[in-house]
C-alpha cells in the first residue's frame, strides 16, 4: 500500500516538473535512461519530503516491500534515523530483513537435514556465493550459504548503524551473539525472538 502511495507521489512530482514518467516498448535507450534518471530524481525528492513530514511508517513499509534497491530508500532512511537518534525506528526498519533472511536459512537447513540427515557446515562456508547465485544450479547447501551471507551482511550493516547511534550495550551484545550464531550456523528459531520489534 505504501509503495503505491510513494509511486503515485513520485509520478505526480514528475508530471508537475515536466519530467518523463511513462515509457513504452518503443522508447529508445536514451529515452528509457532519461525516464529512469527522472524517476530516481523524483524518488529522492519524495523520500526527502516524506522524511521531513515524518512519514516513517510508510517509508519503512516501502523499504520492507523490496520494490526499491536499498540505496534508494532503506539506507538514506537508516542514516536519517541514526543522525536523529531514532533507535526504535531503526530497529523496526532493520530487524525484519535480518529475521527473514535467518528464517529462510533455517527453513533450508531443516530441508537439508531432513533429506541428508546432517549438515556439511564446512562445505557451506566454502561456497562462493556470488558464483552460486549467478549460476543456474540449485542446491540446499548453496541456498543456505546465500541466506547466511545475506543475513550476515544485514547484521553487519545494522551493527554499524547501532554503534553510530550508541545503542544500549545489552542490545548490541544480542546482535553480536546473533551474528556469531548465523556465522557458525548454530542459530535456532528462538534466537530471533529479540528481533521482532514493531512501532
Regions from the language model: what does each represent?
Residues 197-199:
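Non-Sec secretion/translocation targeting segments of pathogen effectors
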Residues 63-67, 71-73, 97, 130-154:
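Acidic, low-complexity, intrinsically disordered interaction modules
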Residues 29, 40, 67-75, 101-104, ...:
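Generic helix N-cap/helix-start motif at coil->alpha-helix transitions
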Residues 19-26, 161-171:
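Charged, low-complexity interaction regions
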Residues 66, 97-98, 162, 182:
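Alpha-helical solenoid scaffolds that mediate protein-protein interactions
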Amino acid at each position: 500500500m505504501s509503495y503505491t502511495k510513494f509511486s503515485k507521489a513520485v509520478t505526480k512530482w514528475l508530471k508537475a516538473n515536466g519530467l518523463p514518467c511513462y515509457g513504452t516498448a518503443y522508447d529508445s535507450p536514451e529515452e528509457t535512461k532519461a525516464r529512469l534518471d527522472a524517476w530516481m530524481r523524483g524518488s529522492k525528492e519524495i523520500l526527502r519530503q516524506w522524511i521531513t513530514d515524518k512519514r516513517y511508517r510508510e517509508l519503512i513499509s516501502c523499504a520492507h516491500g523490496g520494490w526499491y534497491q536499498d540505496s534508494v530508500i532503506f539506507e538514506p532512511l537508516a542514516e536519517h534515523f541514526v543522525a536523529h537518534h531514532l533507535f526504535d525506528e531503526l530497529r523496526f526498519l532493520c530487524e525484519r530483513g535480518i529475521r527473514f533472511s535467518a528464517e529462510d536459512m533455517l527453513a533450508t537447513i531443516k530441508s537439508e537435514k531432513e533429506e541428508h540427515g546432517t549438515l556439511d557446515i564446512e562445505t557451506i562456508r566454502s561456497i562462493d556465493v556470488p558464483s552460486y547465485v549467478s549460476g543456474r544450479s540449485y542446491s540446499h547447501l548453496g541456498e543456505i550459504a546465500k541466506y547466511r551471507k545475506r543475513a550476515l551482511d544485514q547484521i553487519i550493516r545494522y551493527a554499524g548503524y547501532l554503534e553510530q547511534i550508541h545503542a544500549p550495550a545489552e542490545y548490541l551484545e544480542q546482535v553480536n551473539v546473533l551474528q556469531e550464531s548465523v556465522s557458525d550456523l548454530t542459530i535456532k528459531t528462538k534466537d530471533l525472538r529479540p528481533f521482532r520489534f514493531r512501532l
